[in-house]
């Protein structure tokens, strides 16, 4: 029996909506990355992008444990001397709450062309409204 290798025309992608209210940031990101890669499907192959589309709403109400709000820092470097900028998680959640979840999921995906394609299937919104009603996303209850 030959090993099954999924073809691009055989891939079916579903749309799911996840409510991030009172969910822990890292645990939520791990489960989203698992679904974006397609590891929950029996036809998973590491060289094929066969994951689903994930729409995350209420990202501004995400939870973190411990002292991460003040201790966790995000760094950006402009490339110029003195251009290293740092923000705490509290500042990121106050200004752009979507970025905290996107950065967490991005760190759990492969760092190559395939990982960038997987990240494009993640749609994150701070409020409870999203513009993807036409795709009929199913509500997805994650484990924790």
Curated annotation (Swiss-Prot):
Record-level Gene Ontology MF annotations: mRNA binding; structural constituent of ribosome
A Pfam short name: Ribosomal_L13
UniProt cross-references to CDD domains, sorted A to Z: Ribosomal_L13
Cellular compartments per GO CC: cytosolic large ribosomal subunit
GO process annotations (BP): negative regulation of translation; translation
Record key words, sorted: Ribonucleoprotein, Ribosomal protein
InterPro entries per UniProt: Ribosomal_uL13, Ribosomal_uL13_bac-type, Ribosomal_uL13_CS, Ribosomal_uL13_sf
UniProt xrefs under Gene3D superfamilies: Ribosomal protein L13
Xref: NCBIfam families: rplM_bact (TIGR01066)
Record's function text: This protein is one of the early assembly proteins of the 50S ribosomal subunit, although it is not seen to bind rRNA by itself. It is important during the early stages of 50S assembly.
Subunit relationships: Part of the 50S ribosomal subunit.
UniProt similarity note: Belongs to the universal ribosomal protein uL13 family.
Record's protein name: Large ribosomal subunit protein uL13
Gene: rplM
């Amino acid at each position: 029996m030959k090993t099954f290798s999924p073809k691009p025309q055989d891939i079916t992608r579903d749309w799911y909506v996840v409510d991030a209210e009172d969910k822990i940031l890292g645990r939520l990101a791990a489960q989203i990355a698992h679904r974006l890669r397609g590891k929950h499907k029996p036809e998973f192959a590491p060289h094929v992008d066969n994951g689903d589309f994930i729409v995350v709403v209420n990202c501004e109400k995400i939870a973190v444990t411990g002292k991460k709000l003040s201790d966790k820092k995000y760094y950006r470097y402009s490339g110029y001397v003195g251009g290293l900028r740092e923000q705490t998680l509290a500042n990121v959640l106050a200004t752009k709450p979507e970025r905290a979840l996107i950065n967490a999921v991005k760190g759990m995906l492969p760092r190559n062309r395939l990982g960038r394609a997987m990240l494009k299937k993640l749609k994150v919104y701070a409020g409870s409204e999203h513009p993807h009603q036409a795709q009929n996303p199913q509500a997805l209850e994650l484990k924790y």
